[in-house]
A protein has these predicted regions:
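Carboxylate- and glycine-rich phosphate/diphosphate-binding segment that chelates Mg2+/Mn2+
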Residues: 165-272
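ATP/NTP phosphate-donor binding region
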Residues: 1-106
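C-terminal catalytic subdomain
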Residues: 272-341
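Short glycine/serine/threonine-rich phosphate/pyrophosphate-binding segments
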Residues: 34-37, 59-62, 89-92, 114-119, ...
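C-terminal charged capping/lid subdomain of soluble metabolic enzymes
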Residues: 6, 315, 325-398
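Fold-independent oxyanion-binding glycine-rich loops
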Residues: 31-32, 54-55, 83, 110-112, ...
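Glycine/threonine-rich beta-strand-loop-alpha-helix active-site module
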Residues: 90-97, 101-192
C-alpha cells in the first residue's frame, strides 16, 4: 500500500511539474569571473548587496579585488561571515534580521553549501515574514518573490547555485526548504576560488555532485530528456576530472570542469529529484555532523547495490559512457558501482561510518522514510525497515 501511494503521488506530481515555472540561473564562468558580480549589480540597479561568505573568503585576494571595484561604484556591502557547517535556524534568523536592518536589496553568496543554504533560507524567511523557518520546510511553501540571489560556489559539490533547495538544521534534524523561487538568478563559476581546497574537501564535495547526478538519472517519473543529458554529462566529467583535481588542487581546467559538472548535476536533480542516499545522508548530518559529501560518498555504492535489478539498466548505460565493459546489464551496472568504490578508495574516502550508534538507527530510519516518501521517485521505495538495514550496512561498511 505504501509503495502504491508513493508511486501514485509521484505520477501526479510529475504531471503537475510540467506546468511549474522552471528556470536556470544566468551563468558567468571562467577564471576571474567573480568580478562580473559588479556588472550584475550595476546592470540590475542593486546598491546594497548582503554578502554571505566565510572569513577566509572575505580575506581572499579575489574578494578584495571585487570589494575595491564595488567601492569605486559606491556600492556598500553588508557582510555576514559566521555561518557554521550545517546552518541552523538561529543563523538563518540572524541573517534575515541583519539584512532587514541594513536595508539590503540582494544576496551575494560566496562559498560552499552551508553559506548557500543559509542565504537561500534567509531569503525565504524574508519573503515570508509571517512564517517561521520550520514552517517553510518542505516543498513549495514559499511561493513568493525572494530577494535576488547571486551565487558563487567555491566547492564543486552541492550545486546549490542552481537548485530549489536550502537545507537547514534544527537541533539534530535536517530538512530542506524547497521552492522554485530559491533558484538563484545568477551563478558565477570561477575556478580560481576553489584552487585552495584541501584534497579531502575536493573528494567529498565531488562525490556529492556524483550522487546528485546518479540519483537524478535513476529518477523514475520526474526525469526529462534534459535532466538525463545533464546527469550523463556530469557523471562523465566527474570521473574524468575529480581525481585530477584531488591530486592537483591548482589545476584550473579540472576545477572549472568540476564546477560545471556540479552545476549540471544540480540542475538535473532540481527537476528530477534526489533519492534515498540523500534521505539517509541528512540524518547523518543532523545527528552526528557527518559532512554531507562524505555521507553520500559512503552511501552511494551501498544503496545502488541494494536497488539491485531495478537500477541495472540505467547504471549499465552510465557504465557504457565510461567505457566499462560487461556482457549483461547486470555486469555493467556492477562494474559502475565497483568503479565508484575504487575512486573512493583512491581518494582515501572511508567505506563505512562507524559514528552510527545502534540505538539511533530506528530514529534515523524513520526520519529518512519521512523525507523520502512519497516524494522521491527512487527505483525502489524503502520502508523504515529497509532504511534501517542500509544504515546498518553503512555502519559496518559491507
Amino acid at each position: 500500500m505504501n509503495t502504491f501511494f508513493c508511486r501514485a503521488f509521484q505520477c501526479c506530481f510529475a504531471v503537475g511539474a510540467h506546468f511549474l515555472p522552471w528556470r536556470r540561473p544566468k551563468v558567468y564562468a571562467g577564471p576571474g569571473s567573480l568580478l562580473r558580480a559588479a556588472d550584475i549589480l550595476r546592470e540590475n540597479g542593486l546598491r546594497r548587496p548582503f554578502v554571505v561568505a566565510s572569513r577566509r573568503q572575505c580575506a581572499d585576494e579575489h574578494f578584495r579585488a571585487l570589494q575595491e571595484t564595488l567601492d569605486e561604484q559606491d556600492i556598500l556591502l553588508s557582510i555576514f561571515s559566521a555561518v557554521e557547517t550545517d546552518p541552523s535556524v538561529e543563523t538563518v534568523e540572524r541573517i534575515a534580521s541583519q539584512y532587514r536592518l541594513d536595508r539590503c536589496d540582494c544576496f551575494l553568496v560566496i562559498g560552499g553549501g552551508s553559506p548557500m543554504d543559509a542565504a537561500k533560507a534567509a531569503a525565504a524567511r524574508l519573503a515570508r515574514p509571517e512564517k517561521t523557518v520550520p514552517q517553510l520546510g518542505g516543498l513549495l511553501k514559499v511561493r513568493r518573490r525572494v530577494p535576488p540571489l547571486i551565487a558563487v560556489p567555491t566547492t564543486a559539490g552541492t550545486g546549490s547555485e542552481t537548485t530549489i533547495a536550502a537545507v537547514v538544521t534544527d537541533g539534530h534534524h535536517k530538512y530542506a526548504i524547497s521552492d522554485l523561487c530559491l533558484i538563484p538568478r545568477y551563478a558565477i563559476l570561477d575556478p580560481t576560488l576553489s584552487t585552495g581546497l584541501p584534497p579531502r574537501i575536493t573528494a567529498e564535495t565531488g562525490m556529492d555532485a556524483l550522487t546528485h547526478a546518479v540519483e537524478a538519472y535513476l529518477s523514475r517519473f520526474y526525469n526529462t530528456g534534459m535532466t538525463r543529458a545533464l546527469a550523463e554529462s556530469a557523471v562523465v566529467a566527474i570521473f574524468a576530472h575529480l581525481e585530477r583535481a584531488y591530486r592537483d588542487g591548482a589545476s584550473l581546467d579540472d576545477r572549472a570542469a568540476m564546477l560545471q559538472a556540479s552545476f549540471d548535476a544540480g540542475a538535473a536533480f532540481t527537476r528530477a529529484s534526489v533519492g534515498n542516499m540523500h534521505a539517509i545522508a541528512h540524518t547523518l548530518g543532523g545527528l552526528y555532523g557527518v559532512p554531507h559529501g562524505l555521507a553520500n560518498a559512503v552511501l552511494l555504492p551501498l544503496v545502488l547495490e541494494d536497488y539491485g535489478a531495478a537500477a541495472y539498466p540505467r547504471l549499465a548505460h552510465l557504465a557504457g559512457l565510461l567505457g566499462l565493459k560487461g556482457d549483461t546489464e547486470e555486469t555493467r551496472a556492477k562494474a559502475f558501482i565497483a568503479e565508484i568504490r575504487a575512486m573512493n578508495a583512491r581518494m582515501n574516502v572511508p567505506d563505512r561510518l562507524d559514528c552510527i550508534r545502534d540505538e539511533d538507527i530506528p530514529l534515523m530510519a524513520r526520519w529518512a522514510a519521512q523525507e523520502a516518501n512519497p516524494v522521491y521517485p527512487v527505483p525502489v521505495i524503502y520502508d523504515e525497515a529497509r532504511f534501517a538495514r542500509v544504515i546498518e550496512r553503512a555502519r559496518r561498511g559491507v
